[in-house]
Regions:
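Surface-exposed loops/turns
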Residues: 24, 80-81, 194
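Short, isolated positions in well-ordered beta-strands
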Residues: 14, 97-98, 163-164
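Short, compositionally biased P/S/T/A/G/V-rich stretches that sit at domain boundaries
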Residues: 1-27
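Accessory beta-strand-rich segments of carbohydrate-active enzymes
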Residues: 32, 71, 85, 92-93, ...
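Terminal edge beta-strands and adjacent linker/stalk segments
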Residues: 101-104
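Short amphipathic, basic-aromatic surface patches that mediate peripheral association
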Residues: 33-38
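Recognizes extended acidic, P/S/T-rich segments that occur
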Residues: 41-83, 93-97
């Protein structure tokens, strides 16, 4: 009998780690790893279902007669920032069917960026700029997801707790043309929703946005770097 040992999302392992659960496309590719306890047995068909936070089906691939261990999503538009779930079913050469547990993933592809850019009123090279927002929430929060881009690098805390162990976010790019952002989903469990004040803190440091080291100056011959400038922050919490 076949056993599904691992699900994959866009070529990466889908695990409990939040970063592994993010897709940046409306057509993610799901993959899986399977083993069999019978010699010569293998996958002859597969089926993938995707559901929203309510359990409503967004896509059912139906049974596909194939040995390939991947399928590309081809269903309804995926909601952004909300928990979605995927399940994979396999059919063996002997006709036995097995299904994986449902696993959570998120679509982090925002169709439009609504956040404004914040810059420090006074700038000092190699200083860490700290932005703080306090807010109260009354009533249950169903879903909460933070999208944040701090140039050059940012670090985020919610109610005194670091939301991620990463230290080099966001990914580097030519900021004059492209800015990447970090997706931090599932924050509804960390918000105080009884009217008590929440505190969101983002620290932003120079990174590659403003690098005045002698090495960089020597490497560029003193010419101005296109993407250089003051550290900036833009974020959306919804």
């Amino acid at each position: 009998m076949l056993s599904i040992t691992q699900l994959w999302l866009d070529g990466g392992r889908l695990t409990q780690a939040p970063r592994s659960q993010i897709t940046d496309t409306q057509n993610p590719m799901f993959g899986w790893t399977a083993v069999s306890d019978t010699d010569g047995d293998g996958q002859t068909a597969c089926r993938v279902t995707v559901a929203d936070a309510d359990g409503s089906l967004l896509w059912d691939s139906g049974w596909q007669q194939q040995a390939a261990q991947r399928l590309t999503y081809a269903g309804a538009p995926l909601p952004v920032g909300q928990p979605l779930s995927v399940q994979v079913g396999l059919r063996s050469a002997g006709g036995e069917e097995t299904f994986s547990a449902r696993q959570i993933f998120y679509n982090g592809q925002r169709p439009q960026w609504e956040g404004c850019w914040l810059v420090p009123t006074q700038y000092r090279s190699r200083a860490v700029n700290q932005y703080r927002r306090r807010f109260a929430v009354k009533g249950p929060v169903r879903n909460a997801c933070l999208y944040v881009a701090g140039l050059g690098y940012h670090k985020v805390w919610l109610n005194g707790r670091a939301l991620d162990d990463a230290v080099l976010d966001p990914a580097h790019a030519n900021y004059a043309k492209t800015v990447y952002y970090t997706v931090l989903p599932g924050l509804e469990t960390q918000l105080q929703a009884d009217g008590t004040e929440n505190e969101l803190v983002v620290q932003v440091a120079d990174g590659w946005r403003h690098n005045d080291s002698a090495f960089v100056e020597q490497a560029t011959g003193g010419r101005k770097i296109e993407f250089a400038g003051q550290p900036m922050l833009s974020a959306v919490l919804e």
